[in-house]
Every structure is written in structure tokens, then in C-alpha cells.
Amino acid sequence: MTLTVAALQYCASDDAAATLHKIEPLIAKAAKTAQLICLPEAASFLAASRAQLSERAEWENDSASMKKLAALARQHNVWLLAGSLFLRRCQDRKLVNRGLLFAPDGQVIASYDKIHMFDANVGDGQHYFESNSFAAGSTPVIADLGDIQLGMSICYDLRFAHLYRQLARDGAHILTVPAAFTAVSGAAH
């Protein structure tokens, strides 16, 4: 199977609805030629603080962003990889950085919670401690796109080769690494 892929590169605002409105025409344009459209980590919003993150994270079972992305996948009849959304788990109220793959019918067929948290001082005067905000995932995920198996990861997972070896051993044909690096850490990658 041949799969045409489009990667949308943009920086989300701090407002999920505004970000998703902004990318609608980008998805429509990409869908004219691509079968799989990939969005970055933090696909719907970026928070300026832990308090804002906690306030704006959507419940995993009632996410307006998930509903909108499902509708866009369905409308354009494409696979749509939301690099990640910041969601609140129902069972324990913890936040997760979750990648989601929507099928052309709008159903979520795979979800992956980022395993490796970015806890670092990167040299820009900032300190990043994702583990203070997010619960880490524990399970590698491969999504079935028919003839193609897609291995999911997010951003800082990139630093941990064992994850990609496992995904490859388990049959992944494509490895995705949606990311929202800082300016300093992005230049290093």
C-alpha cells in the first residue's frame, strides 16, 4: 500500500477552539492529496503555565477538540493523527499528553500516552518538568491502517531508542514523532 502523508507544522495558541479553527483550512487543503494528515504535539493549545494547563485540559470523555478533529477526519475522509492533546483522565483526574489517531470515519482507533516526560534544563534559562503536570504512559502503541502499521510516540520519546526498537520489532512500518520542542531544544534535534 502507498500512503500519502501531510505534516502540518504550526504553533497552537492558548485557545483550543481558535487553534482548531485556524487549522481547518490547512486540513482541507492537505486532504486533497494526503491520506494521512499529521498534526504536532500540543495540536490544540499550548499553555503558558501549569495553572493554565490544568484549567484548559479537556476531559478525555468529553473533549471538544477530539469531537472537532473526529468531524474533520470524517468530513475529509482521511486518517488524522493528532500529535497530542492535553487531556484529563476520568479515573484519577490526572493529565496526560495523548496522541490520537482518527480513522476516516472519525473513530479514534489508537491512543498513546507519552511515556518519557521532558524534565530538563535546556540552556534558555527555563526549566521544564513535564512530570510535574502529566502522568506518564507505559505502553507502546501501534495503530493498524490496513496494510500499514503506524508506531506512535511523542516528542521527548525521541531520546529513547528502545521504544523505537520495540515498535519496529512489533511490526511498525511508520514511526511518528510529533513534537513541540522549545527553540533551544529543537535546534539540538
Give the residues covered by each predicted segment.
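Active-site catalytic loop in hydrolytic enzyme cores
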Residues: 90-170, 178-189
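Short, acidic/polar
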Residues: 18-27, 158-165
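His/acidic metal-ligating clusters that form di-metal
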Residues: 30, 167, 173
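Cys-nucleophile CN-hydrolase/nitrilase-fold catalytic domain and related Cys-dependent amidase chemistry
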Residues: 16, 24-105, 111, 182-189
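Structural motif
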Residues: 35-36, 150, 174
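Extreme N-terminal starter segment of soluble prokaryotic enzymes
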Residues: 1-6
